[in-house]
Amino acid sequence: MGFLKLIEIENFKSYKGRQIIGPFHRFTAIIGPNGSGKSNLMDAISFVLGEKTSNLRVKTLRDLIHGAPVGKPAANRAFVSMVYSEDSGEEKVFSRVIVGGSSEYKINNKVVQLSEYSDSLEKLGILIKARNFLVFQGAVESIAMKNPKERTALFEEISRSGELAQEYDKRKKEMVKAEEDTQFNYHRKKNIAAERKEAKQEKEEAERYQRLKDEVARAQIQLQLFKLYHNESEIEKLNKELSVKNKGIEKDKKHMDKVEEELKDKKKELGKMMREQQAIEKEIKEKDAELNQKLPQYIKAKENPSHKIKKFRAAKKSLQNAQKQYKKRKADMDELEKEMLSVEKARQEFEERMEEESQSQGRDLTLEENQVKKYHRLKEEASKRAATLAQELEKFNRDQKADQDRLDLEERKKVETEAKIKQKLRELEENQKRIEKLEEYIATSKQSLEEQKNLEETLTEEVEMAKRRIDEINSELNQVMEQLGDARIDRQESSRQQRKAEIMESIKRLYPGSVYGRLIDLCQPTQKKYQIAVTKVLGKNMDAIIVDSEKTGRDCIQYIKEQRGEPETFLPLDYLEVKPTDERLRELKGAKLVIDVIRYEPPHIKKALQYACGNALVCDNVEDARRIAFGGHQRHKTVALDGTLFQKSGVISGGASDLKAKARRWDEKAVDKLKEKKERLTEELKEQMKAKRKEAELRQVQSQAHGLQMRLKYSQSDLEQTKTRHLAMNMQEKSKLESELANFSPRINDIKRIIQSRDREMKDLKEKMNQVEDEVFEEFCREIGVRNIREFEEEKVKRQNEIAKKRLEFENQKTRLGIQLDYEKNQLKEDQGKVQTWEQSVKKDDNEIEKLKKEEQRHMKIIDETMAQLQDLKNQHLAKKSEVNDKNHLMEDIRKKLGSANKEVTHLQKEVTAIETKLEQKRSDRHNLLQACKMSDIKLPLSKGTMDDISQEEGSSQGEESASSSQRSSTVYAKEALIEIDYSDLSEDLKDAVADDDIKQEMSALHQKINEQQSILQRISAPNMKAMEKLESVRDKFQETSDEFEAARKRAKKAKQAFEQTKKERFDRFNACFESVATNIDEIYKALSRNSSAQAFLGPENPEEPYLDGINYNCVAPGKRFRPMDNLSGGEKTVAALALLFAIHSYKPSPFFVLDEIDAALDNTNIGKVANYIKEQSMSNFQAIVISLKEEFYTKAESLIGVYPEQGDCVISKVLTFDLTKYPDANPNPND
């Protein structure tokens, strides 16, 4: 196998000038410090082997010239040449030159194209695109971290199967689309064939159906003309009769108008009174709410002063104690100041006396000059003789002074300890007083808390009783409301019904005489058995409110809106348009008019009842109701006793489950009693709600009790702490100080005994010294006339000592008194601060109590005023209520007069109503006939007007129409009256039928003929009338689809062949590479690991087309169990990645392998294994050129190429070579 012999570089990256690098051995290591240009050498090898510029860490080719990145290129060209030695010994030189901004390729100094250059390298086994000759820095770690899909991409790159990926995807899409088109055209062809067969059958059925349909249309026209002809004849007859009757009614109506005018005036007066009464009621409610709102405020204002007074008393007592303590301490301080003045005065007197004595004695003890000299000479001689004694005495004096200082210190400590004991006694006294105050406050708080608890229990009991009673009342009210209202009305509905009843009473009071009440309250079925049927017919009108006029209705609606009430239905008597009752219906057997089984009062609400009931009939059973509704030539609205309702339109509605509950409302006596019970319960509920409102007061009391409880808790805690901690601590400290004080006396006595003992010894020494002095001063003493020299000296020295001692006593007294005075001053200042604090607290509490009392009085005044105003309003309400009752009695008399007049008019109107009802029914019948013709598309022959003039509105029963619907019906009937029908096509035999029996017989015959023809049509399912056109269209589409299917089938076959060819080529490329790598990887991994137990596996996730999914790579490290790749250690992962790298290289291997720092992630153990493996492989399989920084690795190489930097404008790389074959390896066997 050939190998890379030399590399020649000129001005490439960090290599300035021309440099020859090599020769390269079978295993060469490139070493050098970081930044020296090692990787640039690898870039040079990559460059000469045709690598892209983007992979050489630069943007353009010019940047590869030395110095170009810093703007100082060393030349305008650069090149790299590679000398390759083949097995035969022949050498080939490959060069790549940078000229300007492009590359120039040469083989043996001959310029060639890139393709030829690449082909020559491929013949040597160097694949530029696959880069099978080099491994960049960090590639090992990258391979170790790859997931299965990324490994697949790596194999696609190595095997060059990825070059076919785009063509593969393109041809696969073309194949799938072609197959889908083929399938689509096949199903389309199949469906159109079925359509063609179906279209033939439809054409035959359509022709037969049209013939029958024409015959039915002609028969229907005859039937409708027959009905309309006789309907118009009857309408003309009834119009003449109605005109005669109406003239007789006008006269009687004038009398009624006069009585109604009188009633209207009285209504206005009553309305004014009712509004005044309602205004007073509103004010009473407002005042009651205001009182309930202000009562808790008054209770709170009443409670606040009592708590503040307790606090004030406690503060006042604390002030008195503080003042008492301040006065006592002030007296103690005054005593100390007096004592200080007394000591100062005694000191001054002593100083004056000493001055006088000094002057008198000074004259007596004056010596002559020669005597003084003699005294000093003799004194010096005496000192020399008694020197030993003097030294001993001096020692005693020093010891005596030290003990005296100790004595003074102990006595000072004793005085300080006594002062501290006094301070602790005062603190004990203060703590004792604090305990007394806390105990007093706790007792008071407990008493207050007990009172609050009692009040809370009382209020809680009242509120709970009120709540229980409210629940009981609500439960009873619910039962009452369920009986009064619908069975569907739930617990919330009862309050809604109550609200509606209140509004009803209000509008009755506001508009007396104009608002009659709800329809259900003004009428009653004649027998109980009719209750369900009447309830069903009245329906939603059952709760409608009847008023005298439209204006009253609108005023009531406005009032309900203002009161935020629920929507209500109003029936104004002057606005309703009612169809006359059809008198013929009273003659039907087995049925009665619903209006005939209802009693109503007052009489003038009949119009509203006619509007609600219409011409509805009530029957004993469902069969009769159905027969009468649909059995005759004319339909009727009927209802059975069980509530089953049959509409004219054909709609049937059964008796709902709640109908019986609604029907119970007719029980008048039960309703009255229930209403009375409801009113009584409502009043009681109001009273209990007042008691329940005390919840606010209860919460206030609970809050105050909680606050008191917390303060009591803190006070008890403070008391406990004061007793167990502060008091005990003070007692302990006092005991400790007393113990210390007791120890002072023995110590002081011991020191005094030592001092006294030493005094005796010092006296003895002094006497000895005196004897020596007496011997020396004997003659001198006789001369000056003293017994001994000490008399002379004591006169002067003793006096000075006594004076100094006395002065020291004075100073000690002043110091002691000053310390005590300063302490007392500080304590006095603290006591004065306490007095001021408590004085401020007392003053503040006093002011707050005054404010709270004023606030309590203000709230009490407001409550009294509010209660007085409330009582005054109640008195006004009683007076106004009495006036309203009187006015109501007067109006009742007028209503009776009006009722009598109305009965007379009603009697006269019955005949007119009967005629109007018949006439209206005939008009409705004509409208229904015309409408039926229009809806059924029956073309009537018309001499005036068109079919478009016929209204689409359905003629309904009176009970179902609203006022606006009645107006629209009249307009429709008037418009349709202008339509003239041409009866020339109607046979004369049908026109001549006059008697009812003849008309019924002819009509029955026409109906039977039509029914027979329609029966035949119904048995024939409606055909497609455009069947012929459909058949022609389907034939054309079938031929077109057949052609498209054949073309799509050919395209699919061609696309599949092309795809299979690309798929096979891609699979062959990929599989050849994969099988090679999979076969070699286990052996390579064992060799790298130096252990035959190591195992490595490669497996595709998709064996059929492995390049579409991932490739799994797993290794079993030596001496370990199988684990996923992610769970291997860092070193194990790196070795596994190298095994994969070398296995990939084994597929179409290049003659040399350049590796950049593959040992970076290896530990010392694995470095040796990898280095030995590369050394083995380099002997037989490939030449290895490795960049390395680790000694353990590059020492295994046959030669070293050292790269070192020199500094210039930019780094300049220099190269050294070193042949290691001359130096035997310490461990030459790579298997060890």
From Swiss-Prot:
Residues involved in ATP binding: 32-39
Assembly and oligomerization: Forms a heterodimer with SMC3 in cohesin complex. The cohesin complex is composed of the SMC1A and SMC3 heterodimer attached via their SMC hinge domain, RAD21 which link them, and one STAG protein (STAG1 or STAG2), which interacts with RAD21.
Gene: smc1a
Organism superkingdom: Eukaryota
SMC hinge domain residues: 515-629
Pfam families per UniProt: SMC_hinge, SMC_N
Domain notes: The flexible SMC hinge domain, which separates the large intramolecular coiled coil regions, allows the heterotypic interaction with the corresponding domain of SMC3, forming a V-shaped heterodimer. The two heads of the heterodimer are then connected by different ends of the cleavable RAD21 protein, forming a ring structure.
Descriptive protein name: Structural maintenance of chromosomes protein 1A
Subcellular location: Nucleus; Chromosome; Chromosome, Centromere
Coiled coil (residue ranges): 163-503, 660-935, 997-1068
Gene Ontology molecular function terms on file: ATP binding; ATP hydrolysis activity; chromatin binding; DNA binding
Family of this protein: Belongs to the SMC family. SMC1 subfamily.
Chain residue ranges for the region called Disordered: 350-369, 947-970
Biased composition (Low complexity): 953-970
UniProt-listed SUPFAM superfamilies: P-loop containing nucleoside triphosphate hydrolases, Smc hinge domain
InterPro entries referenced in this protein's UniProt entry, alphabetically: P-loop_NTPase (IPR027417), RecF/RecN/SMC_N (IPR003395), SMC (IPR024704), Smc1_ABC (IPR028468), SMC_hinge (IPR010935), SMC_hinge_sf (IPR036277)
Purpose of the protein: Involved in chromosome cohesion during cell cycle and in DNA repair. Central component of cohesin complex. The cohesin complex is required for the cohesion of sister chromatids after DNA replication. The cohesin complex apparently forms a large proteinaceous ring within which sister chromatids can be trapped. At anaphase, the complex is cleaved and dissociates from chromatin, allowing sister chromatids to segregate.
Keyword Cell division: yes
GO cellular component: kinetochore; meiotic cohesin complex; nucleus
CDD domains from the UniProt entry: ABC_SMC1_euk
